[in-house]
Regions:
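Active-site-adjacent loops and short helices of periplasmic peptidoglycan-processing enzymes
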Residues: 1-55, 64-68
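Domain-terminus/edge residues, biased toward the C-terminal soluble/receptor-binding domains
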Residues: 34-35, 49-51, 55-56, 61-158
Length: 158
């Protein structure tokens, strides 16, 4: 589930501006060792100077997995919220995951559980997926695919 507009609002609420929040993101990336990552916006949409690597995505995902709330969000098929719009009206919204593992549209081998993951798609990045799996012994594995031309193939390759 993505909500680019929500990411921007959260950035402004936390840091006072999107630029200040992006600076915090870049500092945190450096802190966890994601030294080949540079953010220019909070929402992840394409920008020429906005980049990362598979390894840095792993580091960021691994850091996020240390928070129980993040692990819970990864497993959600949908999220419902009620919020107040700028004009004062109450808006009811539902966001649904596009992750085919989470939705149950794609199966995994016996003994493996698709715990959850994050999809991302832009024209420049194409279809991307960072996915957490767990085997029957409880061992966890993070798999990452970037730049897949077709979303359907993304899940076959994973």
């Amino acid at each position: 589930m993505s909500a680019n507009d929500a990411a921007n609002v959260i950035a402004e609420q936390i840091a006072g501006s999107q630029d200040a929040f992006v600076e915090m993101m870049n500092q945190e990336a450096q802190k966890i060792g994601a030294t080949n990552t540079h953010f220019v916006n909070a929402n992840g949409l394409h920008s020429e100077d906005h980049y990362t690597t598979v390894y840095d995505l792993y580091l960021m995902f691994n850091a996020a997995m240390q928070h129980e709330e993040f692990l819970q969000m990864l497993q959600e098929k949908e999220y419902q919220a009620s919020y107040q719009a700028a004009d004062g009206t109450t808006v009811e919204a539902v966001w649904s995951t596009s992750n085919q593992f989470t939705k149950g549209d794609v199966t995994v081998p016996d003994g493996v559980t698709a715990v959850g993951g994050k999809t991302g798609t832009t024209t420049a990045a194409m279809s991307c997926l960072v996915q957490l799996f767990e085997d029957a012994q409880g061992e966890q594995y993070v798999a990452i695919i970037l730049g897949c031309k077709e979303r359907g193939i993304l899940y076959q390759e994973m």
